[in-house]
Amino acid sequence: MNIILALKRPFIWLSRVRHRCGYGVHSPFAFELITCLFYEKTPYYAYKELAQEEKKQKRNHGKGWRNESLKVKRLLFRLVNRIQPGTIIDFGTPSSSSLYLQFGKATADYTFASELSELFLEADVPVDFLYIHCHQSPVLVEDVFRICLARVVQQSVFVIRGIHYSKAMKNLWERLKADDRVGITFDLYDVGILFFDKTKIKQHYIVNF
């Protein structure tokens, strides 16, 4: 984690506290997501198994295995478990989040890539779920977003890590959520979540996650 961001964390939390628990959210879809998915505390059956598998993978991969925030990893699991995507694209540095994505729906067509040259998308196959976690390179984030944007369908969901990591990432997040093809978005600080269901009114929500 960026050290400066870590030091600022308590102040960031306080500045966003009014956005907790869905206060002021009138959209039934957004309110249900915030209260029943983002803040869900259910001890899923898979959490224990995931923790055990993480230990094994960490031993196998060593320092090349990035250990991300448990809160974010569990959110990824819950999102995939709820949406049940047919395809999952995981783009970034090899990390333990890959386990949570795959456990969310074991039968999904899961693809990992760390470079654009590895991002092979079969013709006419939609991108149902995209997780981008290479926020140290905003240009790469945008490139991956644009490539996968051409494959979105109504139920697609994109999750972008580090939207507040730098000024460049903040500016990029503003551009992405303003795209005409994007619908409802959520700023959870650690991640930004974009939906593409245009049957719902486009709105941008801040959530103190």
Predicted stretch roles:
Residues 1-131, 135-154, 164-209:
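A short alpha-helical cap/connector motif
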